[in-house]
Amino acid sequence: MKWVTFISLLFLFSSAYSRGVFRRDTHKSEVAHRFKDLGEEHFKGLVLVAFSQYLQQCPFEEHVKLVNEVTEFAKTCVADESAENCDKSLHTLFGDKLCTVATLRETYGEMADCCAKQEPERNECFLQHKDDNPNLPPLVRPEVDVMCTAFHDNEATFLKKYLYEVARRHPYFYAPELLFFAARYKAAFAECCQAADKAACLLPKLDELRDEGKASSAKQRLKCASLQKFGDRAFKAWAVARLSQKFPKAEFAEVSKLVTDLTKVHTECCHGDLLECADDRADLAKYMCENQDSISSKLKECCDKPLLEKSHCLAEVENDEMPADLPSLAADYVESKDVCKNYAEAKDVFLGMFLYEYARRHPDYSVMLLLRLAKAYEATLEKCCAAADPHECYAKVFDEFQPLVEEPQNLVKQNCELFEQLGEYKFQNALLVRYTKKVPQVSTPTLVEVSRNLGKVGAKCCKLPEAKRMPCAEDYLSVVLNRLCVLHEKTPVSEKVTKCCTESLVNRRPCFSALELDEAYVPKAFNAETFTFHADMCTLSEKEKQVKKQTALVELVKHKPKATKEQLKGVMDNFAAFVEKCCKADDKEACFAEEGPKFVAASQAALA
């Protein structure tokens, strides 16, 4: 790369990077400005989500009351921006409103102390008290007729309840995306409550929304963790890699601009600034649709959709085709004598360009692998640019990438083979045993949840063509392992987990993969109560039965971490036979009472 070209790119990049597409005038009243931009419906929805994500235990009616008060106040400010308190920041207005909740101290304990602080400390304090695993009852789906009646009787309240229930269980759910889910939820009821067979129409749609919603929440949680724990440089690096894969025809300056704006949007949402986030996301969608020619040929059908669908579609858009004539990277990043000069002049820009060039050529790599390669390249330049002969020192840098590329390739290959051989349930069990041996201190419910989700990678990714398997699998595993990190941070029990979670975002998955059996762990004493079952086991759904069995499996491994595969398989086969036998018996409870102790004794003997 010619030095002049690099300097001009640096100028372009830094101006684009600092500017982005958002040009915000200062407004007399921020709340009036957002109300006008978003419209009443979206404004109310976002305020409800914000309050539900902060105060996760408050009853629905309390939140609706707060939202109505904020909305009426916003309308006052729209009518007269200089009215009293209209000039206050949104954090001040929202924080003041949260602090009026009478039961704050008794419901949330020390969170009430946040109210003694001033902004911005007060908002930071509220954010720190968001609970990723709130003690809320599982959502039970009513009968279809009951839901349809509620939908017809009061559609607005029905949809608000959906926003409230999802937001309080997922305090980092991407708010504008949750409005999109609510719109789909509404459309499903509007269509299916008219259908001849309401249940056949509605239930698959609700299942799909639930599964997509959980996945969306987990993906956003990783983005927020990345920003909160590793700073915006880590998030920007992730975004450069991902957008360069999606938009390989876009110039580096264009990708940089999009990255800056995406970082702003996600920083706002992760920080609880949901009105600004939704407004800026709409602006970003508008910008992308006005500049399709310089971004991607795949945006057209997204841009014809209404706002919420458009933003969702743009976020999920498939990768554009790679330009046919991309030159080899070696010329600019290995063979050039100017590498150290360019690197020293503007390290982050040079590394950003390297990441952009590498990612647009490799849609077949996971984002996390691309970031590891950029990190390895950076480490090599740090070392070599201080050496006597820098060029000689970094000449083989691309060869050093090979083991980094092969590690996830082999991991995906081995695990997909295991998945094909075992099927999903038994593949989950294999992962349960693997992870319980690695980190036996982690709570059983967390190990079951995380291993079940890790096991879903098979069905999600292993059927894909080779070129799509690694990005699908490794980036999905990063999302699931982030859930483990988030839960573990709340109640830390394992130094190994803390180390893998906090040392490096891009190396989390390899760190967990490399963990061995924890030799220092003192096995858990055998507790017959854990393996005592009753007739209610027979009425459980298939999924609930699996969770019960998997819970028992984790407890077995915690009791005997060095048990062989054969020993564990023998016990689990006996368990399945015992449950099947008693569920077929005339007096189920009597069977469980009689056969249960025999199963426990046989299990202990098998594992002795």
Swiss-Prot record:
PROSITE patterns: ALBUMIN_1 (PS00212), ALBUMIN_2 (PS51438). InterPro entries: ALB/AFP/VDB, Serum_albumin-like, Serum_albumin/AFP/Afamin, Serum_albumin_CS, Serum_albumin_N. The modification Phosphoserine is found at S29, S82, S89, S297, S443, S513. The keyword Calcium applies. (4Z,15Z)-bilirubin IXalpha binds at K264. Residues 19-24 form a propeptide. The modification Phosphothreonine is found at T107, T444, T446. It is found in: Secreted. Ca(2+) 2 binds at D37, D279, D283. The modification N6-methyllysine is found at K558. GO terms for cellular component: blood microparticle; cytoplasm. Disulfide bonds join C77-C86, C99-C115, C114-C125, C148-C193, C192-C201, C224-C270, C269-C277, C289-C303, C302-C313, C340-C385, C384-C393, C416-C462, C461-C472, C485-C501, C500-C511, C538-C583, C582-C591. Ca(2+) 1 binds at E30, E268, D273, E276. It holds the Pfam family Serum_albumin. Residues 19-210, 211-403, 404-601 form the Albumin domain. SMART domains: ALBUMIN (SM00103). Binds water, Ca(2+), Na(+), K(+), fatty acids, hormones, bilirubin and drugs. Its main function is the regulation of the colloidal osmotic pressure of blood. Major zinc transporter in plasma, typically binds about 80% of all plasma zinc. Major calcium and magnesium transporter in plasma, binds approximately 45% of circulating calcium and magnesium in plasma. Potentially has more than two calcium-binding sites and might additionally bind calcium in a non-specific manner. This is Albumin.
